[in-house]
């Protein structure tokens, strides 16, 4: 056992999950299509339609005489440097930043190109857009084995000689070889990002809502794509009506049957088949179909009538083109965007919606219990990389809007348009620095960044492995504070503070590993080889879900699960990929997302 533990920690430190998450976020090493690069390529300012992101982010200027577009991509992080008062620069070390009350950070550069009336101008490469604080011991840190010895790469985990050389070099730079890193240095102070629990996205949870002495069955899902969350709620009312609420589209409830018609299922039999569960639920499905068909409030029997009803509810009094565009936006971008945002994905959304409704009806018939919200399969841990990703997404969009404004001013004053003369690097830097220095994060959260506890070595390690819950401390939340069986081997049962934080502030167990994002496409290619296909009839086999998205079906789900697990044991599929088979509902769930404690 001792050998196993030693080999585990020889490969990874006690704060490896924080460093690995940060490395996955930044463009460093072999991680060229990083999360930050994806954010830059997904920037859309001044346009609502779809644009091919292979050419990078898109900024369209609001000028009358020309069609001017800015494309941006290829974000890079330089080495951490210090700029002196005389303008000179030199590589920095964490110890120098501590002693001089400076921030340990690197310059951020992006390639820009101005396109006038479809004619591209010469690229402006390596334009500095700001600075990014660097995590100590990350791949971009000057103390990393890839950088500390100059051009020579050290391999301290596999070579004893390199390990000794690395430790000697660390001592020369004033660093403790036993310090694991995993924190930032902001204005000379060491600050750590606290991991937070979050509900798993793209996962359906059913619960009973008891409000005003009324019991209603509710299903909820947080559909997430490219960092944007679109909550959706399906509720069975006391009169038996099944209603959908799309939070981003207002409070207007939509009958499930009407919404399924709008998504392209005209046939009553198809709607019935998509929802049908136990025989006790049949009467509710038929009643809902009849209500939408016959009730004067709805009177919707086909897709065209369903679209007209939605137009009256969500774009009343507007021009026809606007009404149609608003409904298309509702169905494609605001309704379950993780399943796709194209018109061709609507049938799949209708099938997924039917599955959600079936779960609500099964719970209403008491054949199923509500989901356990405290089960750790329903949670994800947001690490340093995820928190930096959220912050960088907001900061880069703010930078793009400011650049658009400055370019429009220059154009209106008949000046030459150059990115370097219009871009203000302090917009990005100040936004990121303020959040890390104060702990006030995007989304209204506070206390995300904290001063690292250096009371003892163990106190520092404990602080960097802390996991907090976003729940309000002043409320009881008895079940959330209790130990749960799924905490076994993942969270420490003893280390939690006394007082109002008890049970809401936890610490990771010693040998946990937290999953990083694994490419869905690699898993989908494996599924194609295992005879998973996209059908015309989604009820013709076992549905295969990849990160909540219905990818296809398979005729024999048990065989697929067996072959998938066999491929995972052989190393063809990464060990972090999980698979679960729900034989009762004929669903196979595969997860490759980040934040799962393994």
For the regions a protein language model found, what residue spans apply to each?
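Extended hydrophobic-aromatic, low-complexity segments
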Residues: 502-504, 516
